[in-house]
Every structure is written in structure tokens, then in C-alpha cells.
From Swiss-Prot:
PROSITE patterns the record matches: SECA (PS01312), SECA_MOTOR_DEAD (PS51196)
Compartmental location: Cell inner membrane; Cellular thylakoid membrane; Cytoplasm
Function: Part of the Sec protein translocase complex. Interacts with the SecYEG preprotein conducting channel. Has a central role in coupling the hydrolysis of ATP to the transfer of proteins into and across the cell membrane, serving as an ATP-driven molecular motor driving the stepwise translocation of polypeptide chains across the membrane. Probably participates in protein translocation into and across both the cytoplasmic and thylakoid membranes in cyanobacterial cells.
Name listed for the protein in its UniProt record: Protein translocase subunit SecA
Annotated source species: Prochlorococcus marinus (strain MIT 9515)
The keyword Cell inner membrane appears for this protein: yes
Membrane topology: Peripheral membrane protein
Gene3D superfamilies, alphabetized: Helical scaffold and wing domains of SecA, P-loop containing nucleotide triphosphate hydrolases, SecA, preprotein cross-linking domain
Annotated TM spans: none
């Protein structure tokens, strides 16, 4: 009713932007007549205007004022550099982002290009802008691709990658616009707050941030906190023994009901992802280990056995992790990518290593942690883009105070979403997927099949291999990851078949007919790699797979490509045509020229990639070699384009890209993202989901209703089932999962918010120390508080002075400050409580000046160094212990719900008391350490 009366709020919002769009369009002609240098000069002028405003409110008002001009400049630069002009709807998207909202834009509507508008505008403040993507590959691609616009306009562009040194990171964070992944930003923030020198801090103060695929980062990954940990020693034989024992234990067929254990040694709750020993299992373990109690604090076993059971039942090889170079490497469940260097905590990773017979790495202890929710809330300006925000609108608003606005599409969507096909068994489903893939492939249409794990992608790959369907595999296995750009470049070609794990989060458009720009880059890389790249670097990435001569298109199967790896023609048929004689000769001359200038086999793969990427830009360059490389790229691209334009036409006529989903995801949003890969920018396309009653989602969350349905349907495994009741069960299962995970995220956020206030206080204190301004004043402040606390602990103001325990008080003060050894009870016996505090604080200051004079005799400046060292040492040690205590508290407060107490309130109250105690201990320890500090000369140290 309200909607009818007031109209759609989204439409009202969009109307508000229309006059500004018209103003930008009017400026287009004025800006288009400027030369490149004049356009760059406009950046300088706008920067000057914004920097004149010191007040943040006035600065924001100035940004609003110059927005039309800034957007018009970016649009013009993009036309010149990328040959891409921002549509009106993209200008609206830019305004939505600038206002700190989430812009929902469908796949293929140019989200990446939209981000250039608010990034340029907010970079004019000189405070830095962060563009956040889900993986290193996309961060690099966007920095190279969209970074051209910013560099052309005179802004500096930085890129953060996983293997960068601190010095490189610092340099890149200092740029006007920095592209990075969410995890790199988060870990750098935590590392900065563990730095011992201000020079080690790599990040600047946060200003404005745009998150690409915002739902993936702020919602899917919000359940898992970022943790930096240090090693602690635990007996390795316990992990091995527990893994052996877990194999001998028998899983119960059902869960316990009404407190009655089922038959078996342990039960598995897949929904809660937990394993629990039954009474029978406890007895069996205690007998096998010859112990009386698995929870004995002197010899604990329960934790090891539970982890071993979880490793056996819930952590599946090639789904949750892969084995790479004798290590268990985590696979990100949302992006399907490996996460080298990341480990599961609480001994879970060690349990998996024991299960797989790998070398067991030492266990770790948390040194610093933060959730993505609290991390991104540190940015004063936060915005995001996604193809699917409306499904999670409530969560964005409640947790992040972010509004969502749906930006209209530039062209009408022509995609067809075909009805789901549901099968009784998984085997039946996979056969049907293989058959539909084969049929669409033979019609000359490209097919993208989304799978949920490495294991499933390889199962489908083997089924297609049996049918002799050439295809490409894109999953977390290293040999496939390295070929990502190449696989995606070809995925839209006629008859191409691509199997991808969790393609939804990959953020790469599939261009019908193939991507001539990427193919030209790959051709150059293939030509130059044997001549310029160091031999030990040569294997990465492998030579591109060849096009298959069988079937009407597609690509060679894995086995074919391996057998051809060393043949000279290996890469030839990957590309749409053989290059003409003229272009081939030019490439040969260029290769010789580059070898002379850059040296034979002296570059790394990354360096060669960088140079080809720079050549692919249109920004002006004075480097003649880069210019020659640019000309060669242009020639190759033009030749490929002539062929691909016909291929694109054929693919369009055949019906465009067909997307197949092989399992419903936990969230409807991720299913919609996968569908969105087809039918970009008004292209034709189609999608279909194939499901089975044995799929995880239905099995875990579908309940008894689905189990009964399985028995009710007496149909063959390869016969699709259609039933209204089944469709409703599916939707209800998905809603159940979404609600379940939302509750988990909400709980993670509420508990971490308690930690967040404490974290901010500790990190602010650390930063003050690192900056080193007035360390003496800070330590004396600690001393004043300590003296007050000692007086309050030993003196009861309600008692008469003659009953005060002055002797004990004096003794305690001397414990902290040995230089006050001459202090006597008679000196203070006539003082009131306030006078006593003031007197002791005065004495502490005199003693501290005396101590400083002693220390400074050794070396001038040593006292300040000691102050910094002891404060940081105490903060870090006590914070680490505090994190452990808070973890233990969180585990234990859950049980208080049984006593009618709210666990969260209990956690807040006790956590606050523990934090106050930690800060008190920190102050006291610093004072004690400073007075006990006795520097040694080098002679003393050597002796």
C-alpha cells in the first residue's frame, strides 16, 4: 500500500541523480576539446580546490560540487585510453558509490568501469582510495586495465599482491588509488598493529574504499575472522594416534534424540559441522589410549580426537583442501581458489595432516585477529558493487549501515532461465549434465558449467572425456589456476566447454566469440617466453592448450594438451588463425630487439607479464621498446579480430553462452551470480540447474520431507523429476540455510564488536608509542595510575588514618620503585588520601628523573628506546594472552544459557573486566620494567 502511495523508493532515488547526469552530459563536449595535457592539468586544478578545504565536512561538500566535472573528465579519459564511454546508467552507479552505498549492477554492465568515477573523485583529496577485489588475479587485472585511466589523468596507481615485500607494500599504499584483495588489506592492518618501529607500518589512515563483489566479501567471508598466529609446540604423536583411533571408530547412522545416544561411537552433525563422541565412543577411546579421562588437564585427549573425527568426516580432500607439494592447502569454499599460507586453527589443520600422512606442522596461537565486518567499518567512506545485493539488503543495512540501490541495465536482458531438472541420484544428475553439455557444444554454442568443488569438476571432466568432448578445466589445482586468463579468454568461443569451480566469484566477463585482446597478449607471451624468461621460471604458466581438431570447436582435453606440450604447433590452434607473414616477421624482429635490450632469459614471468600489460595500455610512453611491443600487440589483435568477429556472429545466431549449474548453493544470491554469466549487456544466453536429491543442500537442510520424497519417487536415476512439492522444499531449504548462516554472521559480529572496542583501544595506544611523541609523559601517566591503584588497594578512606596499613603500602611502592628505598611510613602518616596519592606521584617523578639520568649516561636517547620497547613488549604479550582468555570465555559462556543468562551479556561484562585487568597489568609491568632496567656496556655483554 505504502509503495503505491509513495512510489518505489529505488525509482525515487534514481530520479534524484537524473539532473546531475544531464549536467555531466552537457560538460562532455566542453571536455572533449581539451588536449591530453590539458585534461591532466584539470586533475591538478581539482586537487588544489579540494586540498584547500581542511575541514572534512567542507571537503565533502567541495567533492559534491566538483562531481559533474570530475565524472566528465573520467568519461573522456576512458574514451581516449580504453575506447570505452561510460553510459548514463554507469554515471548513476558512480554517484551511488560516491554516496557510500551499494550499487547493484547486473553482470556485464561494466561495474569495473563504474568504479573509476568515485575512485578518481575521492582520490582528489590526496588521502588515498582502496579498490578491493576477491583475488590477486582480479586486483592485478583491474590495476593494469582501469589503472590506465587514472595514470593517464596524472594519478598514481598501486597494486598489492600476496608475495610483495613490506617496502613495496608501503610504496603502493602511498599511491592515490590502490588495488588489493580483502585479505591482503586485512592482514596488512593486523601486521601494522604488530610493528615495533613506525617505519614498518605500511598502510596510511583509511579514507575511502570501493569493494567489488561486495556480497562475497562482506557476507560470504564474514563468518571467518582474519587471524595472524605464532607457533606453539604440541606433541605431534597425539595427532597421529588420534588419526589412527578415528579410523577404528564407527559413525552413528543418526543423531541423538532426547539425550539418548544413537548406536555407534560418534555422531556427525553436518549442519553444525561438529563431531561428538557417544558414551560408547568415550569408553572405547579411554580403553584404547589406556587413560581414565579424555579431559584430564594433565594429559588431554578429547580435543585431538574431536579434530581427528572432523578431519575424517567433514574435511574432504579435493573439496575443502588439496594436497600440493606434500602440504594440505585450503580451498576457499566461495571462490574455489587455493589459499596458500592459510591454516585452520585449534589443531584442525594438524589433524588433517595426520589423516593424510603428511608432515605435521607446529600448532599456532592467535597473535592478532579481526573480522571483515569490523575491518571495513574502519573506513570513513565505504561503498560496494555487486550483481546481487537486494537479497541481502537487510544485512547490509543492519551490519554495515549501507543502503542498496539497483542501477538499471543499459540494455534489456534477453537471457532465458530454463526450468531446473531434479534427479533422484547424483550419478543420474552428472550423466544428464554431460549429455546436455555435449548437445549444446555440438550446436556450436559455448558452455560454462559451474561446479562446487575440485572433486566434482574432475568427475564431470572424466565424463566429458568419455564422450570425447574437448573442454577446459578451471579449479583450485595449481596447473589450472595458472591458465585462468587464457581459459576465460577462450570461454566464449564457438563450441567451447569450460568447467569452473565456483565461477560465480571470479568477476570476469565471458565475451562471445572470444577475447581478442587477451589472445593477442597470450600470443606475445608464448613467442617471447622462451627467449626472455629465466629457465627456472619457464614452467609457469604452461604453454596454452591447443584447439581440438575434433568436434566443431572447443579445446583439447587435458591428456591431448599434455602430449602436445613440447610440439612446436602446440599453441597455434589455441588462437583463431595463423598470423600473416608480415606480422610473423615483425614479431621475429621485435623478439631479437628485446633480447638485445633486456638480455637473454633474464626476466621472471611476472616481469614479462608487467611489460606486456604496460604495452597493452594506451597511456603515453617514452619507452621505445614498449611502443614497439604495443604496435606488435595491435597487429596481432587486429588479425585475430577479423576471424573472431565471424565467430561472435555464429555464437550469437546459435543462442549465446549456456550456463549449467550443478548444485544449488547455500545462498540464492550465488546461484543468481552464476546465471548472470550468460546474457551480459543484452546478449542472448540461457541457463539451467541440474540437481539431485542427494545434493548436500537438500540432504543437510531439507529435513525428513526430502528423505521421504526420495523413497516416494520410484523412478530411474536418469529420469528428471518435476514436482511442486520438491520445488518448495528446495526453496525452503535455501531459505533455511541463508537464515542459519545470517544468524552465525550476526553472532560473530556481536561477539567481535566486544573485542573491537578493546582492539581499537590497544591499537591506538600502540600507535601513540610507535609515533614516539612524548613517551616519557605516557610512562609517567602509567606511574600516576599505578600509585593511585596502590593507595586505593591499601587505604580504606572510611577507616580512621591510624588503622591504615601504611607499612604494607610503602612496601608495595618499593617493590615497583627500588629507588624509593629511603621512603618511610612516617613521611606519609599525616597525609590524607588525596595528599598521599599526590605525594607518591611526586616521589615517582623524582625517581624517574634520577633513573633517566643514569640511563642516558650510557647512551643519549636510550631511555626513549627503552620506554618504547617495554610498552610494546607488555602490550603485545598481554594482548596475546588476553585473546586466548577471551576465546576461552566465549566457549564457556555458551553454557550459561542453560542458567537463564544471556551469553552475550555475560561475555561483554566479563570481557570488559578482563580488559581493565589487562590494561592495569600493562601499566604496572611497564613501570616495574623501566625501574629495573639496567643497561650493560658492550664489554659487560661480551664478558
Amino acid at each position: 500500500m505504502l509503495k503505491l502511495l509513495l512510489g518505489d523508493p529505488n525509482t525515487r532515488k534514481l530520479k534524484r541523480y537524473q539532473p546531475i547526469v544531464e549536467e555531466i552530459n552537457l560538460l562532455e563536449e566542453e571536455v572533449s576539446i581539451l588536449t591530453d595535457d590539458e585534461l591532466r592539468n584539470e586533475t591538478h586544478n581539482l586537487k588544489s580546490k579540494v586540498s584547500l578545504e581542511i575541514n572534512i565536512k567542507r571537503q565533502n561538500e567541495k567533492l559534491e560540487e566538483i562531481l559533474p566535472k570530475a565524472f566528465a573528465i573520467v568519461r573522456e579519459a576512458s574514451k581516449r585510453v580504453l575506447e570505452m564511454r561510460h553510459f548514463d546508467v554507469q554515471l548513476i552507479g558512480g554517484m551511488v558509490l560516491h554516496e557510500g552505498q551499494i550499487a547493484e549492477m547486473k553482470t556485464g554492465e561494466g561495474k569495473t568501469l563504474v568504479a573509476t568515477l568515485p575512485c578518481y573523485l575521492n582520490a582528489l583529496t590526496g588521502k588515498g582510495v582502496h579498490v578491493v577485489t576477491v583475488n590477486d588475479y582480479l586486483a592485478r587485472r583491474d590495476a593494469e586495465w582501469m589503472g590506465q585511466v587514472h595514470r593517464f589523468l596524472g594519478l598514481s596507481v598501486g597494486l598489492i599482491q600476496q608475495d610483495m615485500s613490506p617496502a613495496e607494500r608501503k610504496k603502493n599504499y602511498a599511491c592515490d588509488i590502490t588495488y588489493a584483495t580483502n585479505s591482503e588489506l586485512g592482514f596488512d592492518y593486523l601486521r601494522d598493529n604488530m610493528a615495533t618501529e613506525i617505519e614498518e607500518v605500511v598502510q596510511r589512515k583509511f579514507n575511502y574504499c570501493v569493494i567489488d563483489e561486495v556480497d562475497s566479501i562482506l557476507i560470504d567471508e564474514a563468518r571467518t575472522p582474519l587471524i595472524i598466529s605464532g607457533q606453539i609446540e604440541r606433541p605431534q604423536e597425539k595427532y597421529q594416534k588420534a588419526a589412527e583411533l578415528a579410523l577404528s571408530l564407527i559413525k552413528a547412522k543418526e543423531l541423538s534424540k532426547d539425550g539418548i545416544d544413537p548406536e555407534g561411537d560418534y555422531e556427525v552433525d553436518e549442519k553444525q559441522r561438529s563431531c561428538i563422541l557417544t558414551d560408547q565412543g568415550f569408553a572405547k577411546c579411554e580403553e584404547s589410549l589406556k587413560v581414565n579421562d579424555l579431559y584430564d588437564p594433565q594429559d588431554p585427549w578429547a580435543h585431538y580426537i574431536t579434530n581427528a573425527l572432523k578431519a575424517k568426516e567433514l574435511f574432504v580432500k579435493d573439496v575443502n583442501y588439496i594436497i600440493k607439494k606434500d602440504e594440505a592447502v585450503i580451498v576457499d569454499e566461495f571462490t574455489g581458489r587455493v589459499m596458500p599460507g592459510r591454516r585452520w586453527s585449534d589443531g584442525q589443520h594438524q589433524a588433517i595432516e595426520a589423516k593424510e600422512g603428511l608432515k605435521i606442522q607446529p600448532e599456532t596461537q592467535t597473535l592478532a585477529s579481526i573480522t571483515y565486518q569490523n575491518f571495513f567499518l574502519l573506513y570513513p567512506g565505504l561503498a560496494g558493487m555487486t550483481g546481487t545485493a537486494k537479497t541481502e539488503e537487510v544485512e547490509f543495512e543492519k551490519t554495515y549501515k549501507l543502503e542498496s540501490t539497483v542501477v538499471p541495465t543499459n540494455q534489456v536482458r534477453k537471457r532465458q532461465d530454463w526450468a531446473d531438472q531434479v534427479f533422484k541420484t547424483e550419478i543420474g544428475k552428472w550423466k544428464a549434465v554431460a549429455n546436455e553439455t555435449a548437445e549444446i557444444h555440438r550446436n556450436g554454442r559455448p558452455v560454462l558449467v559451474g561446479t562446487t568443488s575440485v572433486e566434482k569438476s574432475e568427475l564431470l571432466s572424466s565424463l566429458l572425456f568419455e564422450q570425447q568432448i574437448p573442454h577446459n578445466l578451471l579449479n583450485a589445482k595449481p596447473e589450472n589456476v595458472e591458465r585462468e586468463a587464457e581459459i576465460v579468454a577462450q570461454a566464449g568461443r564457438s563450441g567451447a566447454v569450460t568447467i569452473a569451480t565456483n565461477m560465480a566469484g571470479r568477476g570476469t566477463d565471458i565475451i562471445l566469440g572470444g577475447n581478442s585482446d587477451y589472445m593477442a597478449r597470450l600470443k606475445l607471451k608464448e613467442t617471447l617466453m622462451p627467449l626472455l624468461v629465466k629457465p627456472d621460471n619457464e614452467h609457469k604458466p604452461p604453454i596454452p592448450q591447443q584447439r581440438s581438431s575434433k568436434a566443431g570447436g572447443g579445446f583439447a582435453s587435458k591428456s591431448e594438451s599434455i602430449s602436445n606440450k613440447n610440439s612446436k604447433s602446440s599453441g597455434a590452434s589455441l588462437f583463431p588463425c595463423q598470423l600473416g607473414e608480415d606480422t610473423t616477421r615483425k614479431l621475429s624482429l621485435l623478439s631479437n630487439e628485446l633480447v638485445k635490450s633486456w638480455g637473454e632469459r633474464t626476466l621472471t614471468i611476472l616481469e614479462l607479464d608487467d611489460r606486456i600489460a604496460t604495452a597493452a595500455e594506451k597511456a603515453p610512453t617514452e619507452d621505445k621498446l614498449i611502443q614497439s611491443l604495443r604496435d606488435a600487440l595491435s597487429d596481432v589483435k587486429n588479425e585475430y579480430e577479423k576471424v573472431l568477429v565471424h565467430e561472435e556472429e555464429n555464437v550469437r545466431k546459435a543462442g549465446g553462452l549456456h550456463v549449467i549449474g550443478t548444485e544449488r548453493h547455500e545462498s540464492r544470491r550465488v546461484d543468481n551470480q552464476l546465471r548472470g554469466r550468460a546474457g551480459r549487456q543484452g546478449d542472448l544466453g540461457s541457463t539451467r540447474f541440474f540437481l539431485s536429491l542427494e545434493d548436500n543442500l537438500l540432504r543437510i537442510f531439507g529435513g525428513d520431507r526430502v528423505a521421504n520424497l526420495m523413497n516416494a519417487f520410484r523412478v530411474d536415476e536418469d529420469m528428471p523429476i518435476e514436482s511442486g512439492m520438491l520445488t518448495r522444499s528446495l526453496e525452503s531449504a535455501q531459505k533455511k540455510v541463508e537464515t542459519y548462516y545470517y544468524d552465525i554472521r550476526k553472532q560473530v559480529f556481536e561477539y567481535d564488536e566486544v573485542m573491537n572496542n578493546q582492539r581499537k583501544a590497544v591499537y591506538n595506544e600502540r600507535l601513540r608509542v610507535l609515533k614516539g611523541s612524548d613517551l616519557k609523559k605516557q610512562v609517567l601517566g602509567y606511574g600516576d595510575r599505578t600509585m593511585e591503584e596502590i593507595v586505593e588497594a591499601y587505604i580504606n578512606p572510611d577507616l580512621p588514618p591510624e588503622e591504615w596499613d601504611i607499612e604494607q603500602l610503602i612496601s608495595k611502592v618499593k617493590e615497583f620503585i627500588y629507588l624509593l628505598n629511603n621512603l618511610k611510613s612516617t613521611d606519609v602518616s599525616v597525609l590524607s588520601v588525596e595528599e598521599l596519592k599526590n605525594y607518591l606521584q611526586e616521589q615517582l617523578r623524582i625517581a624517574y628523573d634520577l633513573k633517566e639520568a643514569q640511563i642516558e649516561q650510557f647512551r643519549p636517547g636510550l631511555m626513549r628506546e627503552a620506554e618504547r620497547f617495554f610498552i610494546l613488549q607488555q602490550i603485545d604479550n598481554l594482548w596475546r594472552e588476553h585473546l586466548q582468555s577471551m576465546d576461552s570465555l566465549r566457549e564457556s559462556v555458551g553454557l550459561r544459557g542453560y542458567g537463564q543468562k544471556d551469553p552475550l551479556i555475560e561475555y561483554k561484562n566479563e570481557g570488559y573486566d578482563m580488559f581493565l585487568e589487562m590494561m592495569t597489568n600493562m601499566r604496572r609491568n611497564v613501570i616495574y620494567s623501566m625501574f629495573m632496567f639496567q643497561p650493560q656496556s658492550e664489554k659487560e655483554t661480551k664478558s
